[in-house]
Amino acid sequence: MDMAKNDDKKQLKCSFCGKKQDQVKRLVAGPGVYICDECIELCSEIITDELEEDINTDMSSLPKPSEIKSYLDDYVIGQDDAKKALSVAVYNHYKRINLNNVNDDVELQKSNILLLGPTGSGKTLLAQTMAKFLNVPFAIADATTLTEAGYVGEDVENILLKLIQNADYDIEKAERGIIYIDEIDKIARKSENPSITRDVSGEGVQQSLLKILEGTIASVPPQGGRKHPHQEFIQLNTTNILFICGGAFDGVDKLIERRTRNSSLGFGADIKSKRDENVGELLKKIMPEDLLKFGLIPEFIGRLPITVTLSALDRDALVEILTEPKNALVKQYKKLFEMDNVHLEFKEEALKAIAEEAIRRSTGARGLRSIIEEIMKDIMFEIPSDESISKVIINEETVSNKNPELIEAEGGKRPPIKIKKPRAKKGNETA
């Protein structure tokens, strides 16, 4: 009897449920504690349930594609197809991040985005506005400044440093950010066939970008510049960073046209002149083989599976850009003049003339501000000193001769500017 009692005392048992070793399949030992396989399974189920609850909460707070597009509509004029495609791609990207945080049989692959469109069509603005809406860190990099490691220029890791800096060095936040790489078409290799000489700013940069686009733990020098062995590095996982690469890809339309023309020869083929199909329409037909012929390497094309094309902006779209968005240029200049107690008016004909000048210069929306600055420079210089001006009218002639119509104030002097002084807080007042 005493022997049986001693055996019971010696037998190990689970510290959580109290079951003895012979009552369970396995007992795992720790420093002074034991846990059985049944308790391990129960703990695993609890953790999984809590993770799924967190994911459901994250999914409910994730804006839907229609909400993303609606926000983009407030700031970016036109490009409806591009905004829809971008909204869906970004929504799916953040869904993927949330899903991959739980144990699941299906692993969603990363989907970076390639934006193609003429200069000034809104590529950078779309990416900036998207990041602002999602409230995630955002960084812009210029592909033309990048070179292969070991050569004069920027390493690709410097792109990641910009994102870390914009996230105030919060690594976890940076790892869910968005990076926009502009002028990506400028790192196309110089010829379709691999060159004997080293292409350090073309194919070499594409090779350097492959790992961070796919997802890797990158070593980022905290002070930027070149890496050296005696400095500490910031470790950044790029798996959940969304990369959007943009470029004008001048000349790729000719490659698309040649391919589509060759594939539609023969009886019954549609005969179209160049005038019938603009560059924007041709870009919508782009295929990986066109990008390959342009100079992107196959591995790089594979890391950018989603292609979004933007069309060149016509005159009406440019006029809308001048007036419609929340931060429209016309609204900005009116506000500047209002701060001097001067009313600024743009005639419809003037807006059309400004838009036509931007088209003539082939600068798109990007060139609108410089055109307006040229028109307004002299009058903005005079207004603070000349108190007789109460209203400035910009008409069609002003766009060419830079002489706006000026309206004098009643009595020859406009009212003084009223500046509201901030009221002192009661807590700051002294007796």
Curated annotation (Swiss-Prot):
Organism: Clostridium tetani (strain Massachusetts / E88)
Ranges where the record places region Disordered: 405-431
UniProt similarity note: Belongs to the ClpX chaperone family.
Taxonomy, superkingdom: Bacteria
UniProt name for this protein: ATP-dependent Clp protease ATP-binding subunit ClpX
One of the record's GO molecular function terms: protein dimerization activity
Pfam family, one: zf-C4_ClpX
GO biological process, one term: cell division
ClpX-type ZB domain: residues covered: 2-55
